[in-house]
């Protein structure tokens, strides 16, 4: 196989919290003689030999020991085949096998030369050779905002039972096992380890014996690819499941952290925290590291192990930073491994990405993956400063206030003798106390400039606070510099009175007042002080009731790209949206993921990384109530019950720009929010579900033009074994997307009644047609009993030639209170 025949793509995976930036791509293989390759074989992996999905699988809690034994025996056989192949082809040459993948995909990763990779690729039993690719790192109130205490939790017996018996696997940066959010001794209700979980707790110097318990029931780390490249420093990068970054600890706590854990930050008590499913079990698969991120070979190994261990749900707060090349975005090693995970009955949740708000910015592609975008919620921490002229200026900042008025001093007016602005060009940011004269600052409120360097992480609020404390200032106030205008500010913790004024207009009002009160030396006109005074009110108490939810500007948007040429897929993404802005979660005190919360045990983070675990936790509640639900059934329950309105009953809005996002917003479409905003209580009683299985996904993949050899590469299955193919719009999804409607198209949907009562329910069908499209649904009325399935015919006809996307909804309204919501999107319309 020549070089052009190798599947060569490199794309970053980002931990999608909005404070982290992705690194640029690089092709390391141009400068080294060997590299890590991912090799897949034609034969099928272990999970494909079960021939079962969900309810009969290991993940149903009913798997027999003989089933597990057969799976393990098959896995051992696959590993022997891998070793034999390497010995036979490479003989006594130098190579290093890193992993055998045997459960979800049949293959291995190894350090090879290009010639060795070519020789393996030429073997009949080998289907694919892919270069490893780089991966990189991208609540106290949300349970109440989502209605869990009086809704979904009550249905499960309260917070002490919510998520009981469900295992969530997190592919992330690890976990801090000492955090009380993961203790198994919080309540008197004893945890019991689910018998279907067979994972282990790795013991290292950084993760000593006793780190795991009956809550945190498994922990491993994966770094063979990183080690082979020499980029892993065992001491600096925590070569253990311990979280030295903070991100993994945060996401795990949002989904499944214990209920009622006190949140204390910068010495301030800020309420109590809880995960969405506080009784769910946690299994950690660390594959990303604080200094360099990680590599796909390690990510795939983590996913493969999580599935083999028996997790019920996988949370992925990572996404590629660009579309995978090839005939379709769905064909990449991670998504294809996750397809096998779905076959094993595992529900997979992935963050949409933080590349919004532009259209087609979606970073999660495949229909078997549940993709979550980010919204705001209704809690804010309001702060303000009262000036001596009786003007009150609002701002943000988790800080106490000053009880009395204090004089103000601008940073550039408090320099030491001999120090000038030219000597320290960034002195206005207050990053170095040695630049200032303490006598000029002591007992006053120090006024500093908040520039774009803070947004980039070059300067930090924490360092400015240290400066203010070293100078014994009475408080600290930031005004917004023009370079940072338009960026959305969050409430940073401050251990002295402080405030960040985020409005340019209010910042100018502060400076005008200060400058109007300047004191100058007679004769020289030199500034010797200011008569201006102010009082910081403080921002420790949250306020509620703002318009929420709204889709955040950073949340990636649809339509879902089918390939890297901007062709749109007939798949709706995101699936729905959930809280992802200013989310409190557990944090590792050693974490370096955010400057503002270093050394703290909780942090407030934003990003679709935070949205995904909200849905992961709610999915655990559904899995607890319906243990035999397929992944598609869980996805359907979440989607069809989603809310379309904000707390005021108005249509959910979506921010449209990065700068000044609250000024530029409009009603959210399905390409912004999918089915809508997650409704935890309704999702536990959806009435009807749209189910779909592995075979349907395979028929869909086989229907993509030119896909047969690629499908064989990844699954070991031939498209010829499937009697038919399915267009994407024909998948039995709880949504309809038609990228190009030429004339008329009819699609079918199957709904199954899973109501807990045996009584029949009669549904009336209603719809709102997209612009320039006519819609007809039949039957328009039907009665369905428990466990029964009905087929719905949906016919769409283009009325005009229009190239702009338009949206509609189909609703199924049951006489027992169930409402099933089906979003519709049609992009190109060509009337015939």
From Swiss-Prot:
Q: Does the keyword Protease apply?
A: yes
Where is it chiefly localized? secreted
Q: Where is the Inhibitor I9 domain?
A: 36-136
Q: Name one GO cellular component term.
A: extracellular region
User: Entry's SUPFAM superfamilies?
Assistant: Subtilisin-like (SSF52743)
Q: Which residues form the Peptidase S8 domain?
A: 145-684
| Primary enzyme class | hydrolase
Can you say what this protein is called?
Subtilisin-like protease SBT2.1
State the encoding gene: SBT2.1
